[in-house]
Structures are given as structure tokens and as C-alpha cells.
């Protein structure tokens, strides 16, 4: 369950940012997660609640913004949506795609006191 590890890393980032900005409490965390990242959002939410107990992020809202997958076809050069790895180009049917979006995993913003 790598969601638990991800939440530990998120809390480390929160602590770093909060310490540098002299924050007392984190009220909301906004994550950007690419559609192609293998993250179970329910497990991530559960892990976040567990990991943040006793920290400045305890009871913080976790908001997840999903970034759709997108690729450029190496054959026809069209930008196409990508729902999973090894999708084919919706324009020409080629499987040679270069991923441009969908693998993001970052803390986008925090609301703090």
C-alpha cells in the first residue's frame, strides 16, 4: 500500500512549508494527481487521516485534482487523450505515443492559519 508512504511524504512537505512560513495549523491540502498514477484515492484519503493525527495537518481537508492523461502521437503529431499506458492514437491508431500529462503527483497548495 504505497498510499501510506505517499501520505508520509506529503506530511514531510507540509511540515517543511509550515515551518518556513510559521504556520500553526493546516486546514486544506490540494494535491494534483495524474490519471495514470496508480493511486487509490480512497486509500490515500484514509492514510492521510491516519498519518496526520497529532500533526499540524490533523483534520485538514484533502482535495485531489485529477490531471487527465495526454500524449503526442509520434506518427501523426496529434495531441490525444490517454487513459492508460499503451493506448493507441485516436487519430491514426499508432501505439507510439509520448506522454505529456498524467503522471503528476504533487502538493499544489495549502490553506493554513
Curated annotation (Swiss-Prot):
Example GO molecular function: zinc ion binding
Alphabetized InterPro entries for the sequence: Hydgase_Ni_incorp_HypA/HybF_CS, HypA/HybF
Statement: the UniProt record of this protein carries the keyword Zinc: yes
Organism superkingdom: Bacteria
Positions contributing to Ni(2+) binding: 2
Signal sequence region: none
PROSITE patterns recorded: HYPA
Keywords carried by this UniProt record: Metal-binding, Nickel, Zinc
Positions of disulphide bridges: none
Binding site for Zn(2+): 73, 76, 89, 92
Family membership noted in the UniProt record: Belongs to the HypA/HybF family.
Function statement: Involved in the maturation of [NiFe] hydrogenases. Required for nickel insertion into the metal center of the hydrogenase.
Protein name: Hydrogenase maturation factor HypA
Species the sequence originates in: Legionella pneumophila subsp. pneumophila (strain Philadelphia 1 / ATCC 33152 / DSM 7513)
Amino acid at each position: 500500500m504505497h498510499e501510506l508512504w505517499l501520505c508520509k511524504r506529503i506530511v514531510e512537505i507540509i511540515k517543511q512549508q509550515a515551518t518556513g512560513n510559521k504556520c500553526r495549523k493546516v486546514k486544506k491540502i490540494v494535491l494534483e494527481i495524474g490519471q495514470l498514477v496508480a493511486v487509490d484515492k480512497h486509500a490515500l484519503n484514509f492514510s492521510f487521516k491516519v498519518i496526520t493525527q497529532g500533526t499540524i495537518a490533523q483534520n485538514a481537508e484533502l482535495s485531489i485534482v485529477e490531471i487527465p492523461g495526454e500524449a503526442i502521437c509520434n506518427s501523426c503529431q496529434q495531441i490525444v487523450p490517454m487513459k492508460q499506458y499503451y493506448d493507441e492514437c485516436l487519430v491514426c491508431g499508432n501505439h507510439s505515443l509520448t506522454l505529456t500529462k498524467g503522471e503528476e503527483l504533487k502538493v499544489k497548495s495549502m490553506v493554513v492559519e
